[in-house]
From Swiss-Prot:
UniProt protein name: Chaperonin GroEL
Residues binding ATP: 30-33, 51, 87-91, 415, 481-483, 497
Enzyme Commission number(s): 5.6.1.7
Gene: groEL
Transmembrane residue ranges: none
Family under the similarity heading: Belongs to the chaperonin (HSP60) family.
Top EC class, one word: isomerase
Keyword field contains Cytoplasm: yes
Length: 544
């Protein structure tokens, strides 16, 4: 077993403090509209330029193992806030440092760390309840654009694109961010259900120019096994041909005689048909086929349910107003399924998202929900250079998450103002704490609430304490607009923060800072000293 180096008491706390401070100093320079960029060296390719707190935090690794423990714990604050709310990672880091620094001062002065933590937790609950009270729901397209603009470092173009995307796909819709090939940042919206499986033969294409197969008022056959022979398949094909409507076939695969028959039918000018492979794999494929069946009002023909392809009839087929199939993907527009069944399916998927512990599963479930309920919007980020594109993509990601958080839990006056407005409520709560050290813990949170505002002011070249006093003396929604160096009504000026982001930042910061305050010993491996390399043998160069 490797020997360990153990630090205790004051020495341990100083090491943690140094690690916390080192990480926080790198992260907090990015806060606010006048926050700076951080350039991160990469082992390959060009350096990364970012203003995203969690991206900076993830890159910090300190040489001293004990200091690194403190840094890694605060890194956890940024990561947890990003996981919960998708934004607010810099605010969370600033709050964590403020709570820990002030808490450490009191522990050194003799306060009981466990009582301090209890006081911190109680104070945070009071502030979170107040944040929920003062938040207001997002009601207009304009407010979504304002939240996105603030989160994208005051880039109105990004804000408007995200608001437009949210409006088009709805709150259950999916917004994905990709890199564009050109300089422009554009929005593409795919209406209806889209999945990345194209036609199995180019002979199915109805438009030679676009190489797409477009089926109007189509029937949809959904089967969960391979179709290779024509015998089992023929009865339903004859019924469809008699109906005179085009047919989309979705199956695990269509090959051999079955595919050849369909292709020959198209070449000879028979009824319009197109065959595609089913999307997804394994259990996820079955779930997606069931989604398509509900969307189109058809049935999934599955042998597991005792159904056979040879017994399929028109009543089992789904219906859609339009189907567009390209070489790469398929889009079903206006499926004619029952509204109640569709809503029930969406609710079932939402429940699965809540119950799932895997980020990957959640993402896939969210995609399914979006395809069923709203549609998919793709924001393609363009820029002059790759470095600029990556930095812009980070900001679009932040803005997207901020808008989703705003829709979920409402909005607050931004620029650190909302936390300042919680100070009077917390002051009124202090006398209710009878334990002196718990009261000190609550006061630590009270002092920390002004830290984000002070940091925004400092990054704008102003004295944080003076700005704080000015904001405290003003009415509810008035705060400091660092971009214009003015005091204004933050809601009217469109300087908004999502309530979920503010809440998550405070909860994550207090949780980790409280744990650090109650730490009394640090254990780390002693780094092995590698022996110096042996000197080269004389004359080894053979130059004599």
């Amino acid at each position: 077993m490797v020997a360990k180096n153990i630090k205790y008491n004051e020495e341990a706390r100083k090491k943690i403090q140094k690690g916390v401070k080192t990480l926080a100093e790198a992260v907090k320079v990015t806060l606010g509209p006048k926050g700076r960029h951080v350039v991160i060296d990469k082992s390959f390719g060009s350096p990364q330029v970012t203003k995203d707190g969690v991206t900076v935090a993830k890159e910090v690794e300190l040489a001293d193992k004990h200091e690194n423990m403190g840094a890694q714990m605060v890194k956890e604050v940024a990561s947890k806030t990003a996981d919960k709310a998708g934004d607010g990672t810099t605010t969370a880091t600033v709050l964590a440092e403020a709570i820990y620094t002030e808490g450490l001062r009191n522990v050194t002065a003799g306060a009981n760390p466990m009582d301090l933590k209890r006081g911190i937790d109680k104070a945070v609950k009071v502030v979170v309840d107040q944040v929920k009270k003062i938040s207001k729901p997002v009601q207009h397209h304009k407010e979504i654009a304002q939240v996105a603009t603030i989160s994208a470092n005051n880039d109105a173009e990004i804000g408007n694109l995200i608001a437009e995307a949210m409006e088009k796909v709805g709150k259950n819709g999916s917004i994905t961010v990709e890199e564009a090939k050109g300089f422009e940042t554009v929005l593409d919206v795919v209406e209806g259900m889209n999945f990345n499986r194209g036609y199995l033969s180019s002979y199915f294409a109805t438009n030679p120019e676009t190489q797409e197969c477009v089926l109007e008022d189509a029937l949809v056959l959904i089967y969960d096994k391979k179709i290779s022979g024509i015998k089992d398949f023929l009865p339903v094909l004859q019924q469809v041909a008699e109906s005179g409507r085009p047919l989309l076939i979705i199956a695990e695969d269509i090959e051999g005689e079955a595919l050849a028959t369909l292709v020959v039918n198209r070449i000879r000018g028979g009824f319009r048909v197109c065959a595609v492979k089913a999307p997804g794999f394994g259990d996820r494929r079955k779930a997606m086929l069931e989604d398509i069946a509900i969307l189109t009002g058809g049935q999934l023909i599955s042998e597991e349910l005792g159904m056979k392809l040879e017994n399929a009839n028109l009543a089992m087929l789904g219906k859609a107003k339009k189907v567009i199939v390209s070489k790469e993907d398929t889009t079903i527009v206006e499926g004619m399924g029952e509204k109640e069944a569709l809503e029930a399916r969406c609710e079932s998927i939402k429940k699965q998202i809540e119950d799932s512990s895997s980020d990957y599963d959640k993402e896939k479930l969210q995609e399914r929900l979006a395809k069923l309920s709203g549609g998919v919007a793709v924001i393609r980020v363009g820029a002059a250079t790759e470095i600029e594109m990556k930095e812009k993509k980070d900001r679009v990601d932040d803005a997207q998450h901020a808008t989703i958080a705003a829709v979920e839990e409402g909005i607050l006056p931004g620029g650190g103002t909302a936390l300042i407005r919680c100070i009077p409520t917390l002051e009124a709560f202090l006398p209710m704490l009878t334990n002196e050290d718990e009261q000190i813990g609550a006061r630590i949170v009270l002092k920390a609430l002004s830290a984000p505002l002070k940091q925004i002011a400092a990054n704008a070249g102003k004295e944080g304490a003076i700005i704080f006093q000015q904001v405290m003396s003003r009415s509810a929604n008035e705060g400091y607009d660092a971009l214009r160096d003015a005091y204004t009504d933050m809601l009217e000026a469109g300087i908004l923060d999502p309530a979920k982001v503010t809440r998550s930042a405070l909860e994550s910061a207090a949780s980790v800072a409280g744990l650090l305050l109650t730490t009394e010993a640090l254990i780390a491996e002693i780094p092995e000293e590698k022996p110096a390399a042996a000197p080269a043998m004389p004359g080894a160069g053979m130059d004599y």
